[in-house]
Amino acid sequence: MTNLIHRQNHKQRPRVKTIGLILLKILVAIPIALIIFPILLLPTTTSVPLSIQILFAMALVGWLVTISRFGFTVRIVLVEIAGFVAITLLAIFASQIFASTPPILDAQGRAIPNSIAVMEKVKLGGAEEWVTIRGKDSRNPVLLFLAGGPGGTQLVTARRALTRLEDRFVVVNWEQPGAGKSFDAVDRSKLTPDRYITDAHELVLNLRQRFGKEKVYVLGESWGSALGIMVVQRYPELFQAFIGTGQMVAFLENDRICYDFALRLAQERGDMKQVAKLKQQGPPPYYGNDVALKSATYLIETFNYMAKNPAIANQGFNTLQDLAGSEYGLYDKLNFVRGLSDTFGIVYQQLWNVDFRKQATSLEVPIYFLIGRHDVNAPPKLTEEYFNLLTAPHKELIWFERSGHNPWINETEKFVDTIVNQILMQRGSVELLP
């Protein structure tokens, strides 16, 4: 009997060893799968040519076949992982190198004469920052787009939503320091609103010289609308007009309204956990390292509310689609998110004292506010108050009845038509868009 049990145990040991080896290989396969995951994104989310993608696929398979011949030991596993890391890093590098903005083509797929579609670095304040420059005719007026944030990147979003602006403008989309492709352009810990203003000024001087324009238009959305006011206030001689949408006016009052709104929403739906969280952190202002996290607690509530509001026409951004845009390499896609956490937290706490109702009541350029009626992220009542106080050579407050914080997304057609068929017509001669 003892011998029988001994023989059974002897037979079970190889099975246990085999099962253990299989489990160990599965455990090793999990981090390897995570390591090579970026390579799997190349075909659908980057501009890396197919031939280069095939080379990376061959490298992965070749390395796997080669290393598997040497057995399964700790040393071999470490070498295997190191090889996959090296291949993945090369793939990430390739995605950065080949990132580009799509060409502007006619119906036959040919490049349009005099068109421009480039993505390039420009030196601003001693740092290399990125821009896209797009337009069907490089002789058209120049329009500088200032993205939301701070830390936000909207290269792909703006290209897709505002494509028709390229018919009448040279549209320049600036990747601000600490955002997207310019995430590492500067020491983010030292970023200030003034740095954005001076960089924008230097960029405009560059654009004037490059395109032979005395003045440019500026379109700012959300944070970009506040930055735009600051820039045109300091350098009015450089601008044909300012267009603000999702207009930020007074940051502290704005965010306290958002906080109260979010708290009320949570109370109405009986979400006591969210109520407790909001009450624990209290209303803004916030300072320190968790500004972005605390601000997100109520700002996400406002965006979720607008996303569910049937009065708003187009419910907003397609973040996954934007992340898949050809302008972003794989590292840029990571910084798409990092900018809205790291950079936002650093800069936003420096904006609590900004109130244009006190600090910018007189501007020397034509002003246009394109405002969503249902915006609960930048309350329109603050924009109305500012508009009534403001003196300018020309000013208009234009309502978008089916929009929230982003009329340029919610009512794209009307937004573009307003800029081209109304604003551009007033400021200069141009044919109406069909």
Feature-to-residue mapping (PLM):
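Short beta-strand/loop motif that positions the catalytic acidic residue
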Residues: 363, 369-371, 375
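Conserved acidic catalytic loop of the alpha/beta-hydrolase fold
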Residues: 195-215
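Conserved alpha/beta-hydrolase
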Residues: 166-183
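Catalytic histidine-centered segment of alpha/beta-hydrolase-like enzymes
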Residues: 403-416
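A catalytic-pocket lid/entrance helix-loop region that shapes and gates access to the active site
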Residues: 231-286
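Alpha/beta-hydrolase
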Residues: 272-358, 365
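The serine-hydrolase catalytic nucleophile loop
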Residues: 153-162
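Glycine-rich "HGGG/HGxG" loop immediately N-terminal to the catalytic nucleophile
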Residues: 155-156, 178-191
